[in-house]
C-alpha cells in the first residue's frame, strides 16, 4: 500500500505532500454519472457495495492520488435512526418529519438498532479497501451538522429552526447531539474495523455559529467522538469545519491529528494560528479549477512553495471543500500534475 497519506500524520517531515480531493468520486466524472443512472435514487446506490467501490476507484484510475474516501453520505446516521430521507432534484436531502420536540426525539431508534441498520456502509468500506492500494478514509458528519438537517428538514440559508432550538431549548439540542455523538463513535469504529485507515469528521455547518456556541454545540461533540475513538484505536482523525477559520485557536489543542482548512485563509495564516503538530489539509478554492491551465499551475505553485518552506509540519493537499459537479476533469489533472511537478 502507498502510505504517503498516512505518513503525513507522522513526526517526520515529508519530501512531498500527499493529495486527494473532497468528493473526488462524484458528478464531475462521466464514469460516475454512468453508474448513477443505474439506480433509482442516491441511497440505493450507497447501499450497493460494488457500486460504491466502483465509483471510489474512478478517480484513482484517472489521477495520481494518495488516498480514497468511502463513497457514502453524511446522512446515513439520521436515516438509520428512523428518519425518512429522500434526495430531491433541485432541493437536495429532505427529511419529511424533522425533529421539533422531545416527542420527535423519543421516536428515533435506539443506538443499537440504528447501528444495525448501517451494515451497508461497512460492506462498502470492506469492498473498497480490499480493491485499492492507497489508504481509505472513512467519514461522518459532525453531530451539529447532522442535527442541522434533522431539525430543518433540509438544507437552509439561515437555519432558523436549528438556531431557534439551540437558544430556546438547549437541553433538547444537547440531548440530540449527545445521542448522535454516541452513535457516531460506534459508526466510525465499525468503519475502521472494516478497513478504513483514517477518519474525517465533516462539520459542514459549524461555521454558522458564534464562537462560544461553536465550542459548546459543535466542537465539544467532535472532541468527545475523537477521544472515544482513539481510546479504542489510535488512527488519524481530521476535523473539518467549513467556514471555521475563526475557531482555529479552539481546535488546535483538541484530539484531532489534522485540521481541514478552507480558502478563506491562507495555509500560512492557518499554520500561524494552529501552531505546530497538526497536519493541515486544504485549501484550494474549488472554483480555481474553472481557471486556465496557467492560472491553475500558478495557484498550485504558490501553495506548494509555502508547504515546502515549512520544515516542521506536514500538509495534505486538497480543495477547501468538495469539488463542484461542473468542473472539467482535465483541470483536475492539471492541478495534480502541477502538485507533483512543483513538489519534486
UniProtKB/Swiss-Prot annotation:
It comes from the Bacteria. It catalyses: uroporphyrinogen III + 4 H(+) = coproporphyrinogen III + 4 CO2. One of its GO terms (biological process) is protoporphyrinogen IX biosynthetic process. PROSITE patterns: UROD_1 (PS00906), UROD_2 (PS00907). InterPro entries: UROD/MetE-like_sf (IPR038071), Uroporphyrinogen_deCO2ase_HemE (IPR006361), Uroporphyrinogen_deCOase (IPR000257). Its EC number is 4.1.1.37. The gene is hemE. Substrate binds at residues 23-27, 73, 149, 204, 321. The keyword Hydrolase does not apply. PANTHER family: METHYLTETRAHYDROFOLATE:HOMOCYSTEINE METHYLTRANSFERASE RELATED, UROPORPHYRINOGEN DECARBOXYLASE. Pathway: Porphyrin-containing compound metabolism; protoporphyrin-IX biosynthesis; coproporphyrinogen-III from 5-aminolevulinate: step 4/4. It is found in: Cytoplasm. Catalyzes the decarboxylation of four acetate groups of uroporphyrinogen-III to yield coproporphyrinogen-III. Belongs to the uroporphyrinogen decarboxylase family. Homodimer. One of its GO terms (molecular function) is uroporphyrinogen decarboxylase activity. Transmembrane segments: none annotated. Pfam families: URO-D. Its main location: cytoplasm. The record marks 73 as: Transition state stabilizer. Keywords: Cytoplasm, Decarboxylase, Lyase, Porphyrin biosynthesis. This is Uroporphyrinogen decarboxylase. NCBIfam families: hemE. The keyword Metal-binding does not apply. One of its GO terms (cellular component) is cytosol.
Amino acid at each position: 500500500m502507498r502510505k504517503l497519506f498516512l505518513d503525513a500524520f507522522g513526526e517526520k517531515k515529508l519530501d512531498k505532500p500527499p493529495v486527494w480531493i473532497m468528493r473526488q468520486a462524484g458528478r464531475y466524472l462521466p464514469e460516475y454519472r454512468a453508474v448513477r443512472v443505474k439506480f433509482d435514487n442516491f441511497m440505493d446506490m450507497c447501499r450497493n457495495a460494488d457500486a460504491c467501490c466502483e465509483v471510489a476507484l474512478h478517480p484513482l484510475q484517472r489521477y495520481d492520488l494518495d488516498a480514497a474516501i468511502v463513497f457514502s453520505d453524511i446522512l446515513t446516521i439520521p436515516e438509520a435512526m428512523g428518519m425518512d430521507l429522500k434526495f430531491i432534484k433541485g432541493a437536495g436531502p429532505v427529511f419529511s418529519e424533522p425533529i421539533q420536540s422531545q416527542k420527535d426525539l423519543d421516536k428515533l431508534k435506539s443506538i443499537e438498532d440504528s447501528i444495525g441498520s448501517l451494515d451497508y456502509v461497512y460492506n462498502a468500506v470492506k469492498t473498497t479497501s480490499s480493491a485499492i492500494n492507497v489508504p481509505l478514509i472513512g467519514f461522518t458528519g459532525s453531530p451539529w451538522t447532522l442535527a442541522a438537517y434533522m431539525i430543518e428538514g433540509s438544507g437552509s440559508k439561515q437555519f432558523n429552526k436549528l438556531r431557534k432550538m439551540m437558544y430556546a431549548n438547549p437541553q433538547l439540542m444537547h440531548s440530540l447531539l449527545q445521542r448522535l455523538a454516541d452513535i457516531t463513535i460506534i459508526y466510525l469504529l465499525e468503519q475502521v474495523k472494516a478497513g478504513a485507515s483514517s477518519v474525517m469528521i465533516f462539520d459542514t455547518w459549524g461555521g454558522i455559529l458564534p464562537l462560544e456556541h461553536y465550542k459548546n454545540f459543535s466542537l465539544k461533540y467532535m472532541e468527545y467522538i475523537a477521544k472515544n475513538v482513539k481510546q479504542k484505536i489510535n488512527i488519524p482523525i481530521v476535523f473539518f469545519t467549513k467556514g471555521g477559520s475563526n475557531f482555529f485557536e479552539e481546535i488546535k489543542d483538541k484530539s484531532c491529528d489534522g485540521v481541514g482548512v478552507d480558502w478563506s485563509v491562507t495555509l500560512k495564516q492557518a499554520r500561524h494560528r494552529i501552531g505546530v503538530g497538526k497536519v493541515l489539509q486544504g485549501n484550494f478554492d474549488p472554483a480555481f479549477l474553472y481557471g486556465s491551465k496557467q492560472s491553475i499551475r500558478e495557484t498550485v505553485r504558490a501553495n506548494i512553495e509555502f508547504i515546502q518552506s515549512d520544515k516542521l509540519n506536514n500538509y495534505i493537499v486538497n480543495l477547501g471543500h468538495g469539488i463542484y459537479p461542473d468542473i472539467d476533469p482535465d483541470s483536475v489533472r492539471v492541478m495534480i500534475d502541477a502538485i507533483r511537478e512543483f513538489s519534486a
